[in-house]
Design a protein with these regions (language model features):
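SIR2/sirtuin-family catalytic core signature
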Residues: 1-21, 27-29, 89, 97, ...
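Metabolite-binding pocket within alpha/beta catalytic cores that recognizes anionic/polar moieties
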Residues: 2-4, 8-20, 27-38, 63-128, ...
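A secondary-structure boundary/capping signal
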Residues: 23, 106, 149-150, 193
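Short catalytic helix/loop segments, enriched in acidic residues and glycine
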Residues: 36-54
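N-terminal structural subdomain of ketosynthase/condensing enzymes
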Residues: 51-65
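Short acidic/polar capping segments at secondary-structure boundaries
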Residues: 107-110, 151-155, 196-198, 228
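Active-site gating loop/helix substructures
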Residues: 121-186
Length: 321
């Protein structure tokens, strides 16, 4: 799926927790509503359903027909339908990698459900953030932020972002998450899947990215799309994205087969200082410590030569975390 040189760059950044993920409805297609029967719809299917509900032409965009919904319809068709969902195989693969941050155009909670179901195996804990929340960086890599750009079914009081007016409003600098995404998408490594490059606000974000704007010391940015057309291929060239023709679950399965299991957070973050920690101290407590403080290397000479490395007082304090 990738050239050896691109795969090597991807591995270095992915296994260091440098990759961001941007996903759309396509990654939730094998997830189900809470009745465990009806699968979650694609954006196109959902738009057609709402058009039929409001008795308008089926070619009306979702952004327009959404404005016709009354509060009860919003509760039934969006909030209840997309909350307490059952995660499918695709989103269940995401927690097996370490991500810098996850952005999603989806309002469903399938990804959160995947992290919850696999808490004993997930590389990180998840922290959900709705589009209306103030910007806050994650305190440590042990928590991955899932930023819901269009709203979140578990927080219906904040509303949903489907109208063209709201798209324009939320693509301006007054919304911190939109601003952060537009800035980081231009330079940092991203894997994008489950969404069309013609998504209204995605076009805005990509306008900040060119074929040469990505950082050369990080992995390549990738669009995973099973059925790209000529326009998609051209857009990838313009924005410096590598196009992978596959489903997202196929791509993640291929990565696991090629690269093996991603390293643990403990391996990435913790320096090698055997004997400093109490043996019973959980790994996440060690990670919290090293992502909350600066490591000061010993500089005083010891009586026997070399540097003094008496960590006994540190060991006592860490054992109390």
């Amino acid at each position: 799926m990738l050239k050896a040189s691109d795969l090597a760059r991807l591995k270095a950044s992915l296994f260091a927790g440098k990759y961001n993920l941007l996903i759309g409805a396509g990654v939730s297609l094998d997830s189900c509503e809470k009745n465990a029967i009806d699968r979650l719809p694609s954006g196109w299917e959902f738009q057609k359903h709402l058009c039929a509900l409001k008795n308008v032409s089926s070619d009306r965009p979702l952004s327009r027909v959404y404005q016709l919904l009354n509060p009860k319809e919003i509760e039934k068709e969006l909030t209840r339908r997309f909350s307490n969902t059952i995660p499918g195989d695709t989103v269940k693969k995401i927690p097996h990698f370490i991500w810098n941050r996850i952005y999603t155009f989806n309002i469903d909670d399938a990804l959160e459900g995947a992290y919850g179901e696999q808490r004993d195996f997930a590389k990180q804990n998840s922290s959900s953030i709705n589009f209306n929340k103030p910007y806050a960086s994650s305190s440590s890599h042990k928590d991955v932020q899932i930023v819901h750009l269009h709203g979140y079914a578990r927080e219906p009081e904040a509303g949903y972002v489907f109208s063209q007016t709201e798209y324009a409003f939320n693509s301006k600098a007054i919304n911190p998450w939109m601003t952060v995404l537009s800035q980081t998408l231009g330079t940092e490594p991203f894997i994008i899947s489950g969404t069309s490059l013609s998504e209204p606000d995605l076009e805005y974000y990509l306008s900040h990215r060119t074929a040469v704007s990505g950082r050369q010391d990080r992995g390549p940015s990738i669009l995973v799309e099973p059925s790209p057309d000529a326009i998609t291929e051209n857009d990838c060239k313009r924005h410096g994205l590598i196009l992978v023709k596959a489903t997202f679950t196929e791509f993640l399965s291929w990565l696991q087969a090629e690269l093996g299991d991603a390293p643990s957070l403990e391996t990435i973050i913790l320096p090698s200082i055997d004997g400093v920690f109490d043996k019973a101290l959980p790994a996440l407590s060690k990670i919290s410590f090293f992502t909350s403080v600066d490591i000061v290397r010993p500089a005083l000479p010891s009586a026997g030569g070399g540097n003094c490395q008496d960590f006994s007082s540190v060991r006592y304090q860490l054992g109390k975390i």
